Amino acid sequence: MSVGIIDAVEWQTVVDFKTGGKSDAESEKIDIARRILENHHYPGDLDLEGIDWTVKMALELDKEYKPELMFVMFGTPFFHSVYRQTPEDRWKTIVDYVFDRTKYFLDVTEYEPIIIGLGDMVDIKGYIELNNLDGLYLANNWSYRCSGILEHVEKDLDKIEKMEGISTTISKADFIDRYKPKPEFAERLPDYLLSADEGYQFKGYGSSARKAYKIPALNEHIPVYTKLGEVKDITDIRKVMDKALQHKKVAVIIIEGVGLKDFRYPYEPCNNRVDWYTYDQSENHYLTISTGKHYYQHEIPPVSRYLRKDFDKIIYPFSGPHHYLPQDTAGRKPEIKSAAVSNRGIFPHVVSGADICIESFARNLYNMGSIAIINDDK
């Protein structure tokens, strides 16, 4: 049974992670997580101490659990790009500090690193307004560059063709014919999937209510540093991981909001695109890194249709749109121990598949503490 430990600074509670109900489960991994959470309280998404918090949590997990695979994920640069008008000197300080703390973590542990910058950010050029369509539409709180049309009417397509900022329109039928996705993925696809030009953000039902100052660029390549093997494509990262884990401890360090322009290590540019779709620092980006499979081989599309069955019986209530925990992620490899830490919330436990994952419990910048997820036994 998967278990969640929620730490709200003054109290902790243990829940059945699948149902959300209170649990009295006990185990060595639960004890480890409870001790670590109790000693390090999450300072908030926009606080630079969140970088230190991430590193301290990772060091504690390394000391107490001794995993062979460690995910360390930093969201701070992303938060400061999207939600703040960050001056250039302040931005440099943030990026320098993330890489300084990364170096410290690697210096005091025995991990061989794979360091990934998920991509540069750009100023918003304009908004693509969907409210004037006659059909139903969906935006995505996690993907600024994708949207979907549900139950469309033909004249919507004429309007879409004339909208500034839309780069691609692909029908559900064409998508399925081209990519042969899983049935679960196909079931959730909208009638039409839309993607935006660089700098354009979709606005509509499901988009973020907070004002964004920057959004992910059209990052056709992202920086990857590692001495463990050649990484030409984003799907190569998992292959390099698997090979190295046969005889080494590996740390996969992921830094959001940092691309080729600001990366502080020597790097090889890694292909970050498949056909018309460019990964944009959403959960699909992480899942592709962790599984070695492109987004259309997962179960949740970039913009997902809501289904009646999702609400008939709600499961994994702390996992956002994910109604399952993938079993093909790197952390689910049966022959290794794995752990993950992130100051991004909701999806790190999903995408890492780690035995123990500690992540921030903040929603839309509102800090409610931190949460540890103890995964099902392998």
State where each predicted segment sits.
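Feature captures the catalytic ectodomains and active-site-proximal regions of enzymes
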Residues: M1-K378
